[in-house]
Amino acid sequence: TWIHQGNRQAATIAKRYHAVIAMNGDFFQFNNERYIVRQGKRLRNRPTGEDLLFIDSAGDFHVAHLARKEQITEVNDAVAALGRTVINCFSFGPILVEQGQPVFMEKTDYFNAAARKKTQRAILAQLGPLEYLIVSTEGPEDPGSKGLTLAEAAQYTADIARTLVPTGALYAYNMDGGSSNSLVLNYEKINSPKNPKKRAVSDIIYFASLVP
């Protein structure tokens, strides 16, 4: 992951860090609360009850639903029991897929994720050891597109994952969507090609190459 005190376009950040593919993160600098870990450093310890996504030092996902300090401690202890450490923890959500099944219900209100609104979605999923899936959808700002509610995004991600691996996604997690939704490949933003809007973001999740 990459974070910065200011905001930059995701493609600019990706180029600086030789990212082969990148997506926007959880825009955690929008407020000063939540539970946030980046590159092994805990930046905030003020959980506000969102679903959390933990990524450990082996690259595996762990989740906590509507997490408070007790649930956070449980996940950290479970990761430590594996001989690993938590490298990143994201606080946006919600969790959309768990053990191959969509888990988000349309009737649920979830913080600022616009649960029932059809909009752009950015989703990160784990399919297996060091195997991941990024889902980026268009929304009403894109000509000819309507976007997805969170429940629709959960089902869509679960369906895609099952076409790639028989067991589907281990976990899928909703990141900041809307105009922040940025999917970058080879330093170019490739999602929403008909929408010229490119919002600057404060953090990205990226997969990099050692070759400049």
Regions found by a protein language model. Name each.
Residues 1-212:
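Gly/Ser/Thr/Pro-rich low-complexity, intrinsically disordered segments
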